[in-house]
Amino acid sequence: MRLSNKESKMLADKTVILGVTGSIAAYKAADVASKLTQAGARVEVVMTESATRFITPLTLSSITGRPVVSSMWELTSEFNIEHVALAEAADVVAITPATANIMAHLVTGIADDMLTCTVLATKAPIVLAPAMDENMFKNPVTQENLAKLKARGFVIVGPSYGRLASGKMGQGRLAEASQILDTIKQVLGRSGDLAGRLVVVTAGGTREPIDPVRYIGNRSSGKMGYALASAARDRGAEVKLITAVTSVTLLEPSGVGIIRVETALQMKKAVAKVVKGADALIMAAAVADYQPQSASKVKIKKESPRLTIELARTPDVLAEVKGNFVKVGFAAESEDIMANAQKKLKEKRLDLIVANDITDKNSSF
């Protein structure tokens, strides 16, 4: 089974109001606009006057193929009241970057430009991606405003820790475009066909300690589990992702509950706890079949030319888990792929199994 690099089709034909405010991070809105447009969304950019000092409307218009609105006094060919027309057309509003000033305006209901008027007039969900100096972000007034906006249903993404415009390191850096896009997809998926369902997904590969330094592990990337968690979330499900170690760095899916484990036993306990009340368990993790019979508490010295380690079976998480839910398993095989997958399907009494040919260079293992 192969993973596609294409964005989820859920953004196709959706109208996204992309609000851009006066921050040095405003130039990054171009990347967000590009990703949304490539995913099939109709992107309507609304800029504050100060935002136009950091990035030109022409840049964003060229990316989206749509005119950019930045003034309360611009007439449209349809002669609509612009902020009302935009507000009614929106499936989601995303303000990136969101300054401390715009958040203060939204809290108090001040509507003195096209962007704030549009936000007040819309019934669409609103995503805010704050960006500012760390001291401004941590100011009690800003934190109070953020808390009020969250309480009103605004979805906040970031800010992250990193190098700021001042040259200092701190929290206040605009979230990455991929993270903002992921959050928008999460918000749009709330009313999907899996709304009200709980889906538990496992990912990554477990590690069984030999001593404090060494372990038995595998090459699982975790990509499949993370992609499945994102897909279930995009369709409205509540998702719990139990992740072991991944061989590559992966972006945590926005809006997904993350539980980190390392060993097969930890995986078993986490699954047993989280799966209560679940509608589906998708076991995409590569759980070790064997573990050292007894792990050394101190580092094993290389005093002998040979080292023999006695191994014991680990618990079979998928076979032993109990509950009335759909069970999906994975069979990572290098030979007799279909036969081995069918055997596992029957022996573990699964509802569905995915056969994964790990010899394929495009394998999603």
Task: Give the location of each predicted region.
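A cross-family phosphate/adenosyl-ligand binding-site feature
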Residues: 2-128, 133-365
